């Protein structure tokens, strides 16, 4: 499958540490702009198919995602985008084929091992924010760090940094219901990134937001992942994100293929 790459256009200012991290990330590319082949793939699907009874959702999917890439998967509703993300996360099993996440074959892991891999190495951003209403903003962000055994002082420091970068430094002690939809999604992004996962899976992250807010959230997610060198795989129907992505793929008739720009 031929890769199509574009440069991110426009967007809000990026914190200096994110720019610095992007410079480091850029040096991992070869002179042609392609990722160096020596780097281990973060995600690899080989001939993956998924069917429910007689209904084939995905057929013969081949996909390779390298560290730090931003890959967007588009397609009509019901085309299998969410199913593909669930397979990558090990939340569902393929009918055939192999899925490797961070070099590990998901089918060879126990459920406990898959759960640990998700907890330590994956971050999730969904259409619905799923913030815990009885916890403050700061407590919501710190939750995945607590689950990963990160020291309280370090967790507090990371939380303060994320809130500052989100321009929400004054919101740490507020509760989710006090925030707008766009603000809640920003907090959901911070929570997904707090434990510094290797891969973030985003499923329609702007589905409940107005166009302007959606654009801001997409740019924030892109900047934050690039700043941490995090691989981002996003399923969406939004055309706004195409200019931000390294690659855009589409699911059509159960097959994954290069999307038209």
Language-model features, listed with the residues they occupy:
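ABC-family P-loop ATPase nucleotide-binding domain
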Residues: 2-49, 257-261
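ABC family nucleotide-binding domain
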Residues: 41-43, 48-251
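H-loop (His-switch) and adjacent beta-strand-loop-beta switch element
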Residues: 248-260
